[in-house]
Design a protein with these regions (language model features):
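A late C-terminal transmembrane helix in Major Facilitator Superfamily
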Residues: 189, 193-224
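A membrane-interface helix-boundary motif in multi-pass transporters
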Residues: 17-37, 219-237
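Glycine-rich segments within core transmembrane alpha-helices of 12-TM secondary carriers
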Residues: 1-14, 205-213
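Intracellular juxtamembrane helix-capping segments at the cytosolic ends
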Residues: 177-190
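Juxtamembrane intracellular "pre-TM" segments in multi-pass secondary transporters
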Residues: 51-79
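Helix-to-loop junctions at the C-terminal end of transmembrane segments
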Residues: 20, 124-137, 221
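Structural signature of the two symmetry-related core transmembrane helices
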Residues: 139-154, 234
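C-terminal membrane-cytosol helix-exit motif in multi-pass small-molecule transporters
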Residues: 17, 36-56, 243-248
Length: 260
């Protein structure tokens, strides 16, 4: 799966640049047709996927109500972190090619920036798990919002190809630390029999946010501009960072009380 993200980082932008003018009467129609073909192929491959069956413990083990699971601090911080990770990433990533086009850059330049952004999203996954085991999930998660703040600062201070590339690389790594860390933290909030419900709610919230921010980013860029989008994500990033720091302190206090 992780290697697939790296392949997609090069294949996706490449397809966009190769096919955008496939139909001269409708620019970018070729890219959408190519995307449709890829979706059809993906759907066909899914039919052959072997999904593991739930274990006996997942089927009939002790389970709490979903409301009780979702009210735990670990669950709340994990979900908030993932929502901010996807929401911030989508708003800035989708708006970046639009801003670059407005600054006079061509499609090849925009595709290159998006390519390195996607590489930065998935390449760290090969070491993120090791970093979490070595430094703890809270520390790695806290790095995500910090990197995203640096991404915003770069975006607000220049519109060169270097600015766009560096900002989106930081955004990609920040997304990885925040999302992978949040996913890891989520596993601490549920029992095996609660897994399906807890992850189902988590995924519903995350991908609803991802869909809304992806759809609205273009409109927001057109209506309010590039600078406004970057300023707008800062409060959400701050909320995620505060939530992570709060949970880290809460855990230390609880650990100290147990030792005492």
């Amino acid at each position: 799966v992780m290697a697939g993200g790296i392949v997609a980082a090069f294949l996706g932008p490449g397809i966009a640049t190769w096919t955008w003018d496939l139909f001269t009467s409708a620019p970018y129609a070729g890219s959408y047709v190519s995307l449709l073909i890829l979706y059809i192929v993906s759907m066909m491959l899914i039919f052959f996927a072997k999904i593991p069956r739930p274990s006996p413990e997942e089927k009939s083990g002790p389970a709490r109500p979903l409301s009780q699971v979702a009210s735990q601090p670990e669950f709340l911080v994990a979900v908030v972190s993932a929502l901010v990770a996807y929401g911030t990433m989508n708003l800035i990533m989708v708006a970046t090619p639009l801003q670059m086009k407005g600054c006079g850059f061509d499609l090849v330049s925009s595709a290159s920036v998006v390519k390195w952004h996607i590489v930065a999203m998935f390449l760290p996954s090969f070491v993120t798990g090791h970093l979490i085991r070595s430094f703890g999930v809270i520390r790695i998660m806290a790095c995500g919002p910090v990197l995203m703040v640096f991404c915003v600062l770069i975006n607000l201070n220049g519109i060169t190809i270097v600015h766009f590339t560096c900002a989106l690389v930081l955004l990609g790594v920040g997304w990885n630390f925040l999302f992978v860390g949040g996913t890891t933290l989520l596993t601490e909030a549920y029992r095996p029999a609660e897994k399906a419900k807890a992850q189902g709610l988590n995924d519903f919230l995350i991908f609803s946010t991802a869909a809304m921010t992806a759809v609205s980013s273009g409109f927001l860029h057109d209506r309010f501009g590039w600078t406004a989008i970057n300023w707008a994500v800062l409060p959400a990033i701050g909320i995620a960072l505060c939530a992570i720091v709060w949970l880290g302190r809460r855990r230390r206090v609880m650990l100290s009380s147990r030792v005492a």
